[in-house]
């Protein structure tokens, strides 16, 4: 009896082992299917992003082209504006020069009018003086006559006549004086009126000033010069009229000669065209006869071809009916296959949705871990900087007291040209020189190295292939669930700085302050982290 019990127990254990193997196999198959669906999903996302990138590039190119066209148009408009402004300035300068010339002419006319007025005044003053001299002489003569022939009868007889003559002379002198005054006043009034009129006309019609001044000069000339000038003007007009008639006659003669040559050429061309048309008509008659014969032959061939085409059409209709029936059968098959594919795609979509929901939980876990590591890096870096600065100041104080030697100069502000800065010590925390080849515990790593491990795991989970450094051979990372307990290979940890920012595609990390490096111990290359 005891032997039977033992055998029964062994059979149960074997069944349990087989069931465990089957479950393990099913888990592996489900993981493979998940990986495939994940890969297909990310390929679809990659295609969508690539398509959107091409569209953005085309849009940017079109915007750049539009910007270039607008720049060229603006340059052209500015150039045209500059040319127009230059042309207007040139016209203004020409108008200013013309105004200046007219003003000079006006000044010259005024000066000439003033000279003529002075000459007239001088002339009339001379005439008045001469008349006064004559009057004085006559008066003296009359006095002499009166004194000498006072007693003479003849003087008495002539006295009345002489008095009359004297009155007439006085009256003539008075009239001459009045006429002179009137003419002088009229000339002055005319001069002022003419001056005002010239000033107004110079403001309104500058171009007509020369003609008016010319006409005034003609009025003030004497009759002989005026007649000569008028005759000169008339001859000039007649000469210009005859020249114009001569030119018109020459033009009409030339036009008639050209028309004659043109008519002769047209006659020659018409004769040639008539000859060509006659020859063409004869050729056309021959061609018409040949074409009529060809038409008859083609009609016969067309009748034969129509009969053959009707036979071919009947055969093709029968063949098309057969192909249509076969196509309907094939279409029904394809519809069934399409329905099956749609059902399969729906199942794949549900599976992908479930996978994404599971991945979001893992992503949030790793993002929280990354944020915590960055916080630890920042606190460790600040703590080391404070400790190093206090140690440096204490050494400087001791050296100033003569108890110890002066230390090397050290900076704490991460300057560009500093040779001994705290950041140089902090950069040692990212190096892997203190780790030997083989396996190492995750607790032996610095916070910076832990951050790189997490980012490398992100890249591996998202399907990215990181660029390894040539110094270490690559090896697969450890399991994510036991990352804080198990050991990982250090060859997977060395990567370039640009890959340290890898993260999930489905999520975005908020911008945090740039993480500082944790201070490594200079002798051992290990991190000294304090809580």
Curated annotation (Swiss-Prot):
Keyword Coiled coil applies: yes
| Bias-annotated ranges (Basic residues) | 1-19
- One Gene Ontology term from the biological process aspect of the record: motile cilium assembly
Q: Please, which domain of life does this record's source organism belong to?
A: Eukaryota
Query: Residues annotated as region Disordered?
Result: 1-32, 465-505
Q: Which UniProt keywords are given for this protein, alphabetically ordered?
A: Cell projection, Cilium, Coiled coil, Cytoplasm, Cytoskeleton
Question: According to the record, what induces this protein's expression?
Answer: Up-regulated by foxj1 during motile cilia formation.
**Compartments (UniProt record):** Cytoplasm, Cytoskeleton, Cilium basal body
Keyword Membrane annotated:
no
Coiled-coil positions are 26-213, 274-365
Known InterPro entries for this protein? DUF4515 (IPR032777)
The principal location of this protein is: cytoplasm
According to UniProt, the tissues expressing it are described as:
Multiciliated cells.
The residue ranges flagged as biased composition, category Basic and acidic residues, are 20-32, 482-499
Q: Which GO terms describe its cellular component?
A: ciliary basal body; cytoplasm
- State the deletion phenotype: Cilia in multiciliate cells are motile but fail to produce flow. Multiciliated cells are present in the normal number, cilia of normal length and of normal density. They are however misoriented.
Q: What does this protein do?
A: Basal body protein required in multiciliate cells to align and maintain cilia orientation in response to flow. May act by mediating a maturation step that stabilizes and aligns cilia orientation. Not required to respond to planar cell polarity (PCP) or flow-based orientation cues.
| Family according to the record | Belongs to the BBOF1 family.
Q: What name does this protein carry?
A: Basal body-orientation factor 1
What organism does the record attribute this protein to?
A: Xenopus laevis
């Amino acid at each position: 009896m005891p032997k039977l019990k033992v055998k029964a127990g062994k059979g149960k254990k074997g069944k349990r082992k087989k069931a465990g193997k089957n479950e393990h196999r099913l888990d592996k198959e489900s993981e493979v299917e998940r990986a495939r669906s994940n890969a297909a999903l990310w390929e679809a996302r990659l295609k969508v992003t690539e398509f959107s990138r091409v569209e953005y590039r085309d849009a940017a190119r079109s915007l750049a082209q539009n910007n270039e066209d607008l720049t060229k148009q603006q340059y052209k408009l500015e150039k045209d504006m500059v040319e127009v402004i230059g042309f207007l300035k040139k016209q203004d300068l020409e108008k200013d020069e013309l105004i200046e010339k007219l003003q000079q002419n006006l000044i010259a006319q005024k000066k000439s009018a003033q000279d003529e007025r002075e000459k007239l005044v001088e002339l009339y003053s001379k005439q008045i003086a001469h008349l006064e001299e004559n009057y004085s002489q006559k008066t003296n003569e009359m006095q002499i006559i009166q004194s000498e022939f006072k007693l003479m009868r003849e003087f008495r007889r002539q006295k009345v006549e002489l008095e009359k003559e004297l009155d007439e002379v006085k009256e003539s002198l008075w009239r001459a004086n009045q006429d002179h005054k009137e003419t002088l006043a009229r000339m002055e009034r005319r001069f002022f009126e003419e001056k005002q009129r010239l000033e107004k006309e110079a403001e309104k019609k500058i171009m007509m000033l020369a003609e008016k001044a010319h006409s005034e000069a003609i009025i003030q000339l004497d009759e002989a010069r005026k007649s000569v000038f008028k005759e000169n003007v008339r001859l000039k007009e007649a000469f210009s009229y005859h020249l114009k008639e001569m030119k018109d006659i020459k033009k009409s003669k030339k036009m008639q000669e050209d028309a004659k040559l043109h008519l002769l050429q047209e006659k020659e061309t018409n004769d040639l065209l008539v000859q060509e048309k006659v020859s063409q008509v004869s050729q056309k008659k021959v061609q018409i006869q040949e074409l009529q014969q060809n038409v008859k032959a083609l009609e016969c061939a067309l009748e034969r071809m129509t009969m053959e085409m009707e036979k071919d059409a009947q055969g093709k209709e029968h063949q098309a009916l057969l192909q249509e029936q076969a196509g309907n059968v094939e279409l029904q098959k394809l519809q069934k296959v399409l329905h099956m594919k749609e059902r399969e795609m729906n199942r794949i979509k549900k599976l992908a949705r479930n996978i994404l929901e599971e991945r979001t939980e893992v992503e949030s876990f790793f993002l929280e871990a990354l944020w915590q590591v960055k916080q630890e890096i920042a606190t460790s870096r600040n703590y080391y900087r404070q400790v190093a600065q206090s140690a440096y100041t204490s050494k400087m104080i001791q050296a100033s007291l003569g108890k110890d030697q002066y230390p090397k100069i050290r900076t704490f502000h991460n300057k560009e040209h500093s040779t001994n800065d705290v950041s140089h010590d902090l950069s040692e925390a990212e190096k892997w020189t203190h780790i030997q080849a083989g396996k190492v515990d995750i607790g032996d790593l610095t916070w910076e190295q832990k951050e790189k491990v997490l980012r490398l795991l992100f890249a591996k989970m998202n399907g990215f292939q990181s660029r390894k450094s040539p110094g270490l051979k690559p090896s697969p990372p450890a399991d994510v669930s036991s990352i804080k307990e198990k050991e990982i290979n250090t060859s997977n940890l060395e990567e370039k700085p640009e890959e340290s920012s890898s993260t999930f595609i489905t999520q975005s990390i908020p911008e945090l302050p740039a993480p500082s490096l944790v201070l490594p111990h200079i002798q051992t290359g290990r991190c000294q982290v304090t809580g």
